[in-house]
Amino acid sequence: MLKFLSVITLIPTTSLLVISCTSQTKETTKKTENPTQTLSPDKQTINKIKNILDQQSEAFGSFHTFQDVVDQIKVYAKNEGIKELDKLELLDKKLANKTLTLGNNKNNLKLKYFDIEIPFVLKNVLENEVKTKYSSTNPNEIIQLGYKKNDNYIQLNIENKTITKVPVTLPLKINSFYEAFDGLKSKIVTNLDKWDTSNVKILTNAFNNAKNFNTNISNWNTSKVTDMSGVFFDAEKFDQPIGKWNTSKVTDMSAMFFGAKNFNQDLNNWDVKNVKNMAQMFWDATKFNGKITNWDVSNVVSTNNMFADAESFNQDISNWNTSNVISMDGMFARAKSFTWSLRKWNVKKVVKAQGFRIENKNNLDDDKIPPFKNEVKEYIDD
């Protein structure tokens, strides 16, 4: 009987021992699988970042904040294949909104990447401007884009009219291309197609008089652009497929393709519902016959000379909603190929249509012109 009790007593003790050992083993395994470590980048990555900082030491102006600098450096770091850029930040985040101080070596930024502190001293900060830098071996290659403050915009500033190569990266701060490539003589500008233009709002006269320009910029992000007036004014050779550009915020397309003699692309999918001004848009775009049937022009106020001298144009725009157009002066002047009837157009608000069909009466006879008021119709051939 005593022996029996002994066996009974030993059983739970043994079980407890086994459970305890198993629990300790699992705990040990957990500790082995999840060791506490402080991650640090390798020396090569740190050197890459330092090299970027050295290259960009004169690439900022007085309109930049400390955080602007960090954000821009992150873009260059990403291009270099550096990972986990959320770990690259200001050491003192309270300085994020501080603007840069004018002068040489007066801005000492302290960055950190993981637990590594990296000092960054800006060599030269100019007032509202960043200077353009050119390659020492090729005067037509820009290695640092210049830009300046112009009213409420930060404007790309390119003075050399024979450039053939630009940096891959467009600085984040630039939001205006006003006359940026005005008078450019080059046909191809290497890397221009790679720019992230998602911050750009103004394209006014960007390629004005760039007579040879024909670089493919079809992938540009134009989602924030509000003004496209004169973008390709007299850009005689330009003919690239820009039909996928996002034009949903654009309000002004006046003279956009004025004199763009070779341009002939399908623009049917453009969202133009917010455009108010299409005056002179295709004036003297002699080859243009791209489809624009689906355009919502219900907010357009002016179509003056829109297709004047567009001698190839003959697309069906008979169902356009022209109910808000006030002025149609010279709209189809000398547009000798256009033959569609415009009788369904709503022209109740039109008060001017002088020269509407000048030198084009044979194609746009009285049965095809819009139902103008008599006082307007009187001058359509003048």
Predicted feature residues:
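Negatively charged
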Residues: 2-382
